[in-house]
Curated annotation (Swiss-Prot):
Annotated Pfam families: U-box (PF04564)
Source organism superkingdom: Eukaryota
Gene name of the record: PUB46
InterPro entries reported in the protein's UniProt record: ARM-like (IPR011989), ARM-type_fold (IPR016024), RING-Ubox_PUB (IPR045210), Ubox_domain (IPR003613), Znf_RING/FYVE/PHD (IPR013083)
Signal peptide: none
SMART domains (UniProt xref): Ubox
ARM repeats, residue ranges: 241-281, 283-322
Annotated U-box domain residues: 71-144
Protein's recorded name: Putative U-box domain-containing protein 46
């Protein structure tokens, strides 16, 4: 009796499989009009419900010990997760996927995972039909219908990372290393889960990623593309807050980034500086970078680099100078000469003025600006500042240059600028709150100088 019942159940499952296929595929390329197609789908749905009802009755007669594991209909399985769908949704291509998986996919892609079709939009709608059929099927078959965990969703996007890293770190072919590094660069850029998994989930991952570069000598011309992709992947990984300390404390990272600041493609040098800028957001990393040869390489990049490279290097040095002891190090490395040279040439003026305003509280920095005659460049900027912030930073530098030494002969230079152009009076009226405050302070010094009184510290 049990055998006969099981045979009936198998027959019903096969019938259900055929009906499900008809429901899901109906209208996919045939010539029937919409009314006829809709009528066919409705009939198929009714038939599926009838079969499921019969199947439930049949299954209830089978002793639990005789029930063999059931095979989930492939129409109920999400092709992204390879598991039965919990919340099926339809995307623009007409395909149905598990909501949590396709939502993660659509954050980074605009193609259908199955058809590779470019989607007209990234919206999805619930597939209530399939959801109801899955629910009934699970009840009939006593199938556990659990919600997928976040870890399983993450696993979808990290399953091939270990293999890619293995190819980068141990491949005998440079071409294969480049291909794998390029894919790692792509995945670490597009998928936040990959950034988490790469550092936290793979043992010694940073060392393995950088190993091809650590074996290179000073001449890296033969592997410029490999270097660029590895450095850029490292930058992508450094964006994640929890990765910054782990990356910076790896003994290979700072030396290899320093090397990449000096040599490589323009993009490699920019991204090496961007990585250091990202890492330097953490206070402990400011110390690590400040104690390395990266400081001199960053200053050289400020002087020699293109617009974007100089911007990234300046951002890094700015972060480093938040730590007091690093100010003297960047001055010793030649920052003042490099920065003033770029400003005189009209390049990266806003970023570099912000940096010099920060470091103008350091005595040696002010002395070097004085020797280079930078005060006259500041006057020129203050007469026609490109923005409120530019004017603010320029007047802060002027204030700090003269606040430490209000010698009359020095103040005479500032007084002449005010007499000829009214520079500080304009700033006091039209500048930002901070700029106006500094300009007022300078005007008070000038007034005291004109009256012959020794300027007093505020």
């Amino acid at each position: 009796m049990a055998d006969s019942t099981e045979t009936n159940a198998d027959t019903l499952r096969r019938e259900l499989q055929k009906v499900l296929t008809e429901i899901l595929n109906d209208g996919g390329g045939n010539d029937r009009d919409e009314t006829e197609a809709f009528s066919g789908v409705v009939k198929a749905i009714d038939e599926a419900v009838r079969i499921l009802t019969c199947l439930r009755k049949v299954e209830s007669k089978i002793p639990e010990s005789d029930i063999s594991p059931v095979e989930v209909p492939k129409e109920f399985i999400c092709t992204l997760s390879n598991t039965i769908m919990i919340e099926p949704v339809i995307i623009a291509s007409g395909q149905t996927y598990e909501k949590r998986y396709i939502t993660e996919w659509l954050k980074h892609e605009r193609t259908c995972p199955k058809t590779k079709q470019v989607l007209s939009h990234r919206l999805w709608i619930p597939n209530h039909l399939i959801s109801d059929l899955i629910t009934q099927w699970c009840l009939v078959n006593k199938y556990d219908h659990q919600k997928p965990s976040d870890e399983l969703v993450a696993e979808l996007f990290t399953s091939d990372i270990e293999a890619l890293l293995q190819r980068v770190s141990s491949s005998s072919s440079v071409a294969d290393q480049i291909e794998a590094a390029k894919e790692l660069r792509h995945q670490t850029k597009k998928f936040p889960n990959v950034r988490v998994f790469f550092v936290a989930g793979i043992h010694d991952s940073i060392t393995r990623l950088l190993s091809p570069l650590s074996t290179l000598d000073e001449a890296v011309d033969s592997s410029l593309e490999l270097q660029e992709n590895i450095v850029t992947a490292l930058f992508n990984l450094s964006i994640l807050e929890s990765n910054k300390t782990v990356i910076a404390e790896n003994c290979l990272v700072i030396p290899l980034l320093t090397k990449s600041l000096k040599q490589g493609t323009d993009e490699t040098r920019r991204n090496a500086a961007a990585t250091l800028s990202s890492l330097s957001a953490i206070d402990s990393n400011k110390i690590i970078i400040g104690n390395s040869e990266a400081v001199k390489a960053l200053i050289d990049l400020i002087e020699e680099g293109d617009l974007l490279a100089t911007k990234e290097a300046t951002s890094t040095v700015f972060n480093l100078c938040i730590v007091l002891e690093n100010k003297g190090k960047v001055v010793s490395a030649g920052l003042i000469h490099a920065a003033t040279k770029k400003i005189k040439a009209g390049s990266n003026v806003d970023e570099l003025l912000s940096l010099l305003a920060l470091i103008s509280t350091h005595n040696r920095a002010v002395e070097e600006m004085d020797k280079l005659g930078f005060i006259y460049d500041l006057f020129s900027i203050l007469r026609k500042p490109s923005s409120l912030l530019t004017g603010e930073n320029a007047v802060v530098i002027v204030f700090n240059m003269y606040d430490r030494n209000r010698d009359r002969s020095r103040l005479k230079v500032v007084g002449e600028e005010e007499n000829q152009h009214g520079t500080f009076t304009k700033l006091a009226k039209q500048g930002s709150v901070r700029a106006a405050r500094k300009a007022q302070g300078i005007l008070q010094w000038i007034k005291r100088f004109v009256t012959g009184k020794e300027p007093q510290r505020a």
